[in-house]
């Protein structure tokens, strides 16, 4: 492994580890969820982006390392000088645009999904809440079997296929490819974040669970089977929740998952 590749690997892992620490110790998101204050939204965006770095960076390591390798091959003349001046910049821009996609996604989820969702859930009957969350889980589970999911996960599983289709030279190319990779990743993973947001912003337990699932989907060559297995589980949980057999979210106590007999009345 070349020196620059080692630096990239260590940097991604270090940022991910630091972001996990930040996510564990971050402030409660509830005040931000009920407010459109720009300062609070900015704080949320920073916290959300740190959480995305924690969850997603381990899974994108193969993509970033291959990008660096392709840049090195492309810049075979005076490789050492070019690596120091351009390769690092392009890799940083590639990863940066990937994070920008997720940062904007977080703001969109907050304003268009979480705030109204929180308002509806907190004022609804527990049975209605069960149906709402059951519907979300069923919808997310069905998506795991769609052609769009299959296409997006294909590019995430195979970095080489992604670059063969989307390769673009220069700094602008790094920005463009980072954006496309972020969008493909979003297309692959958005149901998990829809669920995570609905059940509790940046809850460390859900973050860890979905991070493991995403890592399995992206790293394993049969990641689509991970996705479909998760889809089956989500649909099953959604049906049970809709029928009132389990409580996915208790709007009187907070996020929970328990048999209906233990439901708080």
Where are these regions (language model features)?
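Alpha-helical transmembrane segments of helical membrane proteins, especially in multi-pass transport
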Residues: 143-151, 173, 177-201
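Hydrophobic alpha-helical transmembrane segments in multi-pass integral membrane proteins
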Residues: 108-110, 180, 184, 239-253
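Histidine-/acidic- and/or cysteine-rich, low-complexity loops and terminal segments associated
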Residues: 1-50, 73-83, 117-126, 147-168, ...
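Juxtamembrane transmembrane-helix termini in multi-pass membrane transport proteins
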Residues: 45-99
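Transmembrane alpha-helix/helix-exit interface in multi-pass inner-membrane proteins
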Residues: 103-118, 122, 131-158
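Membrane-interfacial entry segments at the cytosolic side of transmembrane helices
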Residues: 124-131, 222-232
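Alpha-helical transmembrane segments
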Residues: 39-57, 126-142
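A small-residue-rich subset of transmembrane alpha-helices
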Residues: 82-114, 189-222, 229-234
């Amino acid at each position: 492994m070349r020196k620059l590749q080692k630096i990239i690997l260590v940097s991604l892992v270090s940022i991910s580890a630091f972001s996990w620490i930040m996510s564990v110790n971050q402030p409660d998101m509830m005040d931000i969820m009920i407010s459109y204050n720009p300062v609070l939204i900015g704080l949320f965006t920073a916290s959300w982006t740190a959480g995305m770095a924690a969850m997603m960076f381990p899974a994108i390591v193969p993509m970033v390392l291959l990008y660096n390798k392709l840049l090195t091959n492309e810049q075979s003349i005076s490789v050492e000088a070019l690596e120091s001046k351009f390769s690092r910049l392009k890799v940083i821009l590639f990863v940066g645009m990937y994070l920008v996609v997720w940062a904007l996604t977080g703001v969109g989820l907050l304003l268009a999904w979480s705030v109204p969702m929180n308002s509806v859930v907190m004022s609804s009957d527990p049975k209605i809440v069960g149906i709402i969350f059951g519907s979300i889980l069923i919808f997310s589970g069905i998506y795991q079997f769609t052609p769009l999911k299959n296409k997006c996960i294909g590019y995430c599983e195979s970095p080489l296929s992604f670059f063969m289709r989307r390769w673009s030279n220069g700094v602008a190319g790094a920005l463009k490819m980072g954006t496309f990779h972020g969008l493909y990743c979003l297309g692959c993973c958005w149901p998990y974040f829809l669920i995570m947001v609905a059940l509790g912003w940046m809850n460390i337990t859900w973050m860890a669970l979905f991070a493991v699932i995403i890592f399995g989907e992206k790293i394993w060559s049969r990641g689509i089977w991970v996705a479909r297995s998760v889809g089956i589980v989500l649909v099953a949980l959604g049906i049970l929740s809709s029928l009132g057999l389990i409580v996915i979210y208790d709007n009187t106590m907070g996020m929970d998952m328990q048999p209906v007999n233990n439901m708080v009345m």
